[in-house]
Design a protein with these regions (language model features):
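Structured, hydrophobic secondary-structure cores that serve as assembly/anchoring elements
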Residues: 4-258
Length: 258
C-alpha cells in the first residue's frame, strides 16, 4: 500500500498492529515487544503511518462490544484536521487528536513504553485521565531522520505538489520564454504565500528563469521550476524550566543563563 501511495502522491496509508499483538495479551511489556517486532518488518516509507491502538467500542450493527483497530480513527483524525485546520497541521495531541467512542484500549502504553515505540516509528494511542483517548505521536513510517518523518510535513507536500502540478500542466505547449516563466511564478508564489500565512511554511523560494531553463532545456522542449520549501515543524517535546530568583535581582540578569 505504501508503495502505491508513493507512486500516486495523493494519499497516505494508516497501518495498525495485528489483533494478536495486543488484544488478549495481559502483559504490557509483551505487547510492546510484539509491536516493535511486527512493525520492524515493514518497509520504510513517509507515505505510511503506524499506530499502536485497538479500542473497545460498541458495534451498533451487531449489538455487541468489540475491539477494533484504531488505524481507521487515525485516518479520520487527518480528515478532521483538514476541516478544523489545514493538512499541514499535526493530527495528534489534545487539539486535533482525540479519538471518539473508545471505552478502553487493549494496550495503553506508559511513558517508558512510548519512548521505546516512538523511535521505532510507532505512534502511541493512549488514554489520559481527564482528557480521553488520543493519538500521541505524529511520525510517518520513514526509517531515517528527515523532514518527511512527520505526518504534517508529508501531508503539506502532498497538498502543495498536487496544487502546483496543476499550475505546471497549464504551461504545457506554451512558449518557454520569460513571459511564460513569470506567469508561472505569479501563480505559484501567491499560493505559497497563502500557505505560509496559514502556518504551513517558514519560507519558500521559486526559481523559474534562465538559470534552470537553459538553452539546452529549451531545445529539449522542457520547462523547469525549482521550488524550495521550509516546512513548519510540529512540537514533539516540551521543556519547562522554573527558576526562583531573589527579590532584588533584575530579570535581565538571569534570562538566558539557565
Amino acid at each position: 500500500m505504501c508503495i502505491r501511495d508513493r507512486s500516486r502522491k495523493d494519499c497516505v496509508t494508516t497501518i495498525g498492529p495485528h489483533r494478536a499483538n495486543v488484544v488478549g495479551v495481559t502483559n504490557s511489556t509483551t505487547q510492546t515487544d510484539n509491536l516493535i517486532k511486527y512493525f520492524s518488518s515493514l518497509a520504510s516509507s513517509s507515505y505510511g503511518i503506524f499506530d499502536s491502538g485497538y479500542k473497545y467500542t460498541y458495534d451498533r450493527f451487531n449489538n455487541k462490544f468489540r475491539y477494533i483497530p484504531t488505524n481507521g480513527d487515525i485516518a479520520g483524525l487527518m480528515v478532521r484536521t483538514n476541516v478544523v485546520a489545514y493538512p499541514w497541521f499535526s493530527p495528534a495531541g489534545q487539539q486535533r487528536g482525540i479519538i471518539n467512542n473508545a471505552i478502553k484500549l487493549a494496550y495503553n502504553p506508559n511513558k517508558s513504553q512510548r519512548d521505546k515505540l516512538y523511535p521505532q516509528r510507532i505512534n502511541a494511542v493512549v488514554t489520559q485521565p481527564g482528557i480521553g483517548t488520543l493519538l500521541f505521536g505524529d511520525k510517518t513510517a520513514l526509517g531515517y531522520a528527515s523532514a518527511f518523518d512527520r505526518i504534517n510535513v508529508r501531508r503539506l507536500f502532498l497538498t502543495v505538489e498536487q496544487a502546483l502540478q496543476k499550475a505546471a500542466e497549464a504551461q504545457l505547449f506554451e512558449l518557454n520564454d520569460e513571459l511564460t516563466r513569470a506567469n508561472f511564478r505569479n501563480i505559484v508564489e501567491p499560493y505559497l504565500r497563502d500557505v505560509q500565512a496559514k502556518r504551513g511554511l517558514y519560507g519558500f523560494l521559486v526559481v523559474c528563469d534562465s538559470t534552470n531553463n537553459t538553452p539546452d532545456v529549451i531545445d529539449n522542449n522542457e520547462f523547469r521550476a525549482d521550488i524550495f520549501l521550509k516546512p513548519a515543524k510540529s512540537i514533539n517535546y516540551v521543556t519547562l524550566t522554573f527558576v526562583a530568583t531573589r527579590t532584588g535581582v533584575s530579570f535581565d540578569e538571569v534570562v538566558g543563563r539557565v
